C-alpha cells in the first residue's frame, strides 16, 4: 500500500487543479451552479482516468479491481491534499453499491462504468413532504401498465436533482399491503416526460437541494431493482451505505482530522492556542476523530465486527455528523464577533467558511436518519432498552 500511497501523492502534486477562480461548494449538497458542476465533473473524470475512482470495483463493469484497502489509501491522500470532492456522490456511495449487490447483469453493464466516470449523474428519491424520518409512509406510487410503470408523486431534499440522469427511487407498488411491504425500488430515468425538478434554497443561500415532481412519468419495467415489494429491504441496505459514508467521502475539503487541524490553526492565528480550555476542547475533538476512524477501520474488516454489524454504520453516522457540527460551532465561537460576518465580507475570517460549515452541518444530522432516531435505534436494537412511546 505504501507504493500506492506514493504514486497517488505524486499524481496529486502534478494534477491538483488548484483554485478555479470562483467559489466552490463545500459538498455535493451545495452544487447549484453549472460552472461549479462542470468543473467538479471534469475533476472526477480525471481521477477516474487515472484509476483512482472505483479502485476496488470489479474490472468487468468499469472498476479497477485493486486489492482491498486501496480506495481508502487513495481517499486519504485526496483528503490530505484537500483535493476537490467527487461530485457524483449518490452514485458512488449508494446507487453503485446497490446495483452491484442487487442489480441484474444488464444493470451492472449499463450503469457502473458511466457512474464511475461521471458520464451519468445520480440522485436519490426517498424523502417526501411528510415522509422523511417515517420513510415507510411514502405516498409516491408506481402503477404497472404492461411493460412499464407509471410514477406519480413528490420527492424532496434531492441532492443533484437538477443535474441527475438517474434516480434511485422508492415508490409504492401495492397500496393494499402494510406500509413496509408495498414499496418497490427503481433505477428511474430523470430525463423523461412527466419529471419536473424545482430548486430548494437553503439558509446559506445555496440551492443544491431540489424537489422532484413525478406526474404520470412512464419508465420501462426493467427499471425495477430486485423484486416488486422488496423496496423496504433495499432501502434499508441503502441507508446502511449512506450512514457508513457519512464518515467521509473521497476528496473534498479534507477529512475530519484535517478539519480538527484547521481549527487548531485558527486558534493559533487568534492567539488562543495557549488557552487551557481551548486546548482541552481541541484534544477532545482529536480523541473523538480517532474513535471515528477506528470504527471505520472495524467496519471495513469483517473479522473485527461484532455480532451486531448494523450498529457500526449507525454509530459512524451519528458520531461523525455531530462531531462536524460541534467542531464548526467551536470554530465560530473562537472567531467571536467575526462569526457574524458572511462570505464576501472583507473582514470575515477565512471568508466565513466556518459559518458556512456550521449551517450546512445540520443537513448531516438529519439526512439518512436524524440523530434522535439513530439514538433510539441503537438504544432499542443494540442495547435492549425499552421502546420510546
What positions do the PLM features span?
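Amphipathic, small/basic residue-rich leader segments at the start of a protein or domain
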Residues: 1-89, 110, 114-117, 269, ...
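C-terminal helix-coil-helix/basic helical segment that borders enzyme active sites and/or dimer interfaces
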Residues: 22-30, 272, 276-279, 290-347
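N-terminal glycine-rich flavin-associated loop
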Residues: 87-106, 132
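A short, Trp-centered hydrophobic/proline-enriched beta-strand micro-motif
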Residues: 118-126, 170
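A short core secondary-structure module
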Residues: 148, 152-198
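Glycine-rich beta->alpha junctions and the first turn(s) of the following alpha-helix
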Residues: 195-294, 364
Amino acid at each position: 500500500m505504501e507504493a500506492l500511497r506514493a504514486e497517488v501523492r505524486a499524481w496529486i502534486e502534478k494534477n491538483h487543479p488548484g483554485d478555479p477562480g470562483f467559489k466552490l461548494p463545500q459538498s455535493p449538497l451545495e452544487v447549484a451552479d453549472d460552472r461549479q458542476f462542470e468543473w467538479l465533473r471534469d475533476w472526477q473524470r480525471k481521477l477516474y482516468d487515472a484509476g483512482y475512482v472505483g479502485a476496488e470495483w470489479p474490472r468487468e463493469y468499469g472498476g479497477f479491481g485493486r486489492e482491498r484497502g486501496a480506495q481508502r489509501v487513495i481517499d486519504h491522500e485526496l483528503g490530505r491534499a484537500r483535493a476537490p470532492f467527487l461530485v457524483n456522490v449518490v452514485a458512488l456511495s449508494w446507487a453503485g453499491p446497490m446495483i452491484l449487490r442487487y442489480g441484474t447483469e444488464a444493470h451492472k453493464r449499463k450503469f457502473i462504468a458511466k457512474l464511475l466516470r461521471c458520464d451519468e449523474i445520480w440522485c436519490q428519491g426517498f424523502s417526501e413532504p411528510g415522509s422523511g424520518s417515517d420513510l415507510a409512509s411514502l405516498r409516491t406510487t408506481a402503477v404497472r401498465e404492461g411493460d412499464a410503470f407509471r410514477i406519480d408523486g413528490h420527492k424532496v431534499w434531492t441532492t443533484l436533482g437538477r443535474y441527475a440522469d438517474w434516480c434511485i427511487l422508492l415508490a409504492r407498488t401495492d397500496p393494499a399491503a402494510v406500509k413496509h411491504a408495498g414499496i418497490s425500488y427503481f433505477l428511474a430515468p430523470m430525463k423523461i416526460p412527466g419529471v419536473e425538478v424545482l430548486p430548494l434554497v437553503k439558509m446559506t443561500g445555496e440551492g443544491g437541494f431540489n424537489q422532484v415532481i413525478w406526474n404520470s412519468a412512464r419508465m420501462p419495467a426493467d427499471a425495477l431493482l430486485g423484486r416488486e415489494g422488496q423496496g423496504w429491504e433495499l432501502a434499508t441496505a441503502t441507508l446502511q451505505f449512506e450512514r457508513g459514508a457519512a464518515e467521509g467521502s473521497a476528496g473534498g475539503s479534507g477529512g475530519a482530522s484535517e478539519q480538527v487541524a484547521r481549527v487548531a490553526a485558527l486558534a493559533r492565528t487568534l492567539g488562543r492556542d495557549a488557552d487551557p480550555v481551548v486546548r482541552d476542547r481541541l484534544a477532545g475533538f482529536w480523541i473523538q476523530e480517532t474513535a471515528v476512524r477506528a470504527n471505520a477501520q472495524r467496519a471495513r474488516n469483517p473479522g473485527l465486527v461484532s455480532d451486531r454489524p448494523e450498529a457500526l454504520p449507525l454509530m459512524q453516522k451519528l458520531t461523525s455528523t455531530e462531531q462536524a457540527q460541534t467542531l464548526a460551532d467551536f470554530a465560530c465561537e473562537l472567531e467571536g464577533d467575526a462569526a457574524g460576518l458572511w462570505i464576501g465580507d472583507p473582514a470575515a475570517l477565512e471568508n466565513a467558511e466556518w459559518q458556512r460549515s456550521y449551517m450546512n452541518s445540520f443537513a448531516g444530522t438529519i439526512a439518512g436518519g436524524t440523530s434522535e432516531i439513530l439514538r433510539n435505534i441503537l438504544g432499542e436494537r443494540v442495547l435492549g432498552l425499552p421502546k420510546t412511546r
